[in-house]
Amino acid sequence: MQKKKGYVSFVLHAHLPFIHHPESDDYLEESWLYEAISETYIPLLKNFKKLVDEGVDFRITMSMTPPLLSMLDNKLLQQKYIKYLERMIELSKKEVKRTAKNEQVNKLSHYYLDRYSSDLHLYKDVFKCDLISQFKHFQDIGVLEIITCGATHGFFPILYVNEKTVKAQIAVGVQTYKKYFGKQPRGIWLPECGYIPEVDKYLKEFGIEYIITETHGILYADPTPVYGTFAPIVSPGGIVAFGRDIGSSRQVWSSVNGYPGDYNYREFYRDIGYDADYDYIKPYIAHNGVRVHTGIKYYRITGKTENKDYYNLQWAKDSVERQAGHFFDCRNMQIENISQYMNKPPIILCPYDAELYGHWWYEGPYWLYTLFKKIYYDDCNFKLITPSEYIDKYPEMQVATPCRSSWGANGYNGVWLNPTNDYVHKHLHTAGDRMCELAQNYPNAKGIQQKALNQCARELLLAQSSDWLFIITNGTMVDYAKKRIKDHIGRFTKLYHQIKDNKIDKDFLKDIEEKDCVFPEIDYRIYK
């Protein structure tokens, strides 16, 4: 057996913006959550359980953001997800009949029927609609470390115009984590990996020990880190920073050379929501008749061609095992080369969006399972580790200030501040200043005034979500993103004036409390 010379640390960022529409039974954007549960969260949980049952000692870290936790805990969304699964089972049964004369497609339609039926059984009967407890279980037995995030994924480098709004994002993030996991989080995934040194004092105040940064956040730190991204640094403010490894990231992330582009893998963009006859598929697409992804996909990537071949489950499995072996060999070689120049074992940090695994890269959760099993059983020079474990083992670190950075395109603030969305920020900053004004002027509010102030805090936080700015920049669901910003700023502003005029509209307040029911324990005084 080779001597262990280093470590690999996987960090998956599980996040969705808070989307909750009790006014509609079929709101298109709520399907983002249902797809993530079926394609990412349940497959990850199934593979974690499989590894534990097989006696495989593995380690993985996940950030679970407060909006995601709030949605997973929401009773209405839980019932809507069950209805979503029942609808998918109904469609899958129709597909089994429709494809009876095509053996290859029929096999896949049976596969989808089995998968959605299994999801329903697991979610309803085994998990009792409680995915959070399932993830907590794996943290409690020591194979998973869960870390927190900003309250609504607000982008700190721009919000810091009013630093109290960043403090509130961190405070509510930590508070939400404690509510669901019963302990203090040691790490935080800074939203969009957006780092500025000024936030260290607030991270420290709320007990955060470490952050994840983009590669250049470490490489351009001051002074230059001796070991680059292969060892964490600690800021003068006492916050440990782990930087993303370039090589392992490209192997998974790259749209050109990354593993998810393998020709045997499932083609994300070919879905019966677009391919099937319109009248046939209409009951299963958006209520306004717009074609959308259903999750039933029969083709593999095949190549750079419009003529796609049918998806073959065994071929995809073979590619997974080959690529897990390739990643394993690359990390083995990388650590062999690096370790000889270091006086402590290197750590290769591999952070990714959780939704890459399963949603975008359908085979991703099985790839993790295959890789973790290989690391445990095969002869290699590294082990899996969490950032917290590495800090505990190797507490001595170089002191350096990470560079201002993000993991957005070009590495800084441009995705969230550019000509497509710059008009939003004056409204966010004005609302932030007004929230601080309210907290200062009404320190002892009670009754309906207190409820209105707490709702103001919720509306501000929801408006600050970086997701809306990202969507506007990318030009995807732009109308929805703009509507969400307008709604939350509008609700905040209306409440602000009602509080100032001492004329709070109880019906209006009740309505938005039901719609924007995130963070029930929030205390507006965090903005003082």
Sequence positions of predicted segments:
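Active-site and substrate-binding clefts of carbohydrate-active enzymes
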Residues: 2-59, 64-107, 223-528
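Short, solvent-exposed turn/loop segments enriched in Gly/Ser/Thr/Pro and often Arg
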Residues: 63-68, 150-152, 187-196, 387-392
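Conserved beta-strand positions
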Residues: 64, 190, 212-213, 352
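Active-site-proximal, glycine-rich beta->alpha crossover segments in alpha/beta enzymes
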Residues: 76-140, 146-160
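CE4/NodB-like, metal-dependent polysaccharide N-deacetylase domain
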Residues: 163-190, 330-342, 346-349
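Conserved short loop/turn motifs at secondary-structure junctions
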Residues: 185-195, 353-357, 477
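Hydrophobic, small-residue-rich alpha-helical packing segments that form membrane-like cores
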Residues: 194, 199-208, 224
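His/Asp/Glu-enriched short active-site or ligand-binding loop at hydrolase and phosphoryl-transfer sites
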Residues: 208-221, 385-386
